[in-house]
Amino acid sequence: MTASETIVCKPTPWFLFRALAIVVMFGVFAVLFYRDGATGYRKKNGIFYLNKTFQRAGGDFSKMNASGTLTAAEWRKFAATQAVDFPEDSSVLPANTHLPVPWPAILQDYERMKPLQPNILWREYTKERGVNSGPPEEPYSAQAIREQWIVCGICTLLVLVAGFFLIRTVRRSISADGEAITTQTGKRIAFADLKTLDLRKWETKGLAFIDYEDKLGKGKIRIDGLTYGGFKKENDEPAERLMRKIRSCFSGEIIEYATFRASESSGGESKPS
């Protein structure tokens, strides 16, 4: 490595994969919560109340035919005046549900109701319409539906934040030449302005911190070798090469090889060996 050589460390595949995984994860969560808030819970409520109506219809038929004298005309007349037991709050029901909703035709059919098997009729009804025959144990409240929208909004915000940092990091790099170090923010700082190089976390976490003071004031540089450059030997360990370059040009105080408490050194990602 010559004195004039420039070492450039770009974002590592390790970081990009993790960041992209976070974006995808929260994106999937946002879609799932959106689906439940927009249609999922409301459709399940529709199934719940329809199923309850089938059970009630079976009970009504049994009571009216207790003496065995109920006629088909009497049942059709009664069933035609009945409505599905939907709540008045349309916000918890499937979109375009116009109340009142009359009983399905299958419940108005005397011959099909006569065996008093509402569960079988329910399965036939749902099979004909290609919907899930298993209703939820309890209906979802308006509050539960609002919560899906809230969590969807939170996940969407996290996607935007994570995506912002991912895009920003992809465009960044850390580099060092014979005169200065250029940080990931694009600030160029001469080696002569570097005061302290803290390497206590370099061996365990791939982190180093440099204090500097130039004409604009004091500051700190954070070098994350796992994010920029990496330590893969097949790539000639770009982060290590960058650090060797910095150390070869550094004339300030170096702090290194401190012993960490077990609880401190065990957490987080470790620098690859």
Annotate each predicted stretch with a short phrase:
Residues M1-A142:
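N-terminal membrane-targeting/pre-transmembrane regions
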Residues L16-G27, G153, L157-V161, I167:
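Alpha-helical hydrophobic membrane-insertion segments
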Residues A142-T156:
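N-terminal membrane-entry
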Residues V151-C155, I167-S173, G217-R222:
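Long, charged, alpha-helical interaction scaffolds
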Residues L158-D198:
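Conserved beta-hairpin
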Residues R188-Y228:
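Acidic, Ser/Thr-rich low-complexity segments on the non-lumenal side of membrane proteins
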Residues K218-S273:
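A membrane-cytosol interface segment of integral membrane proteins
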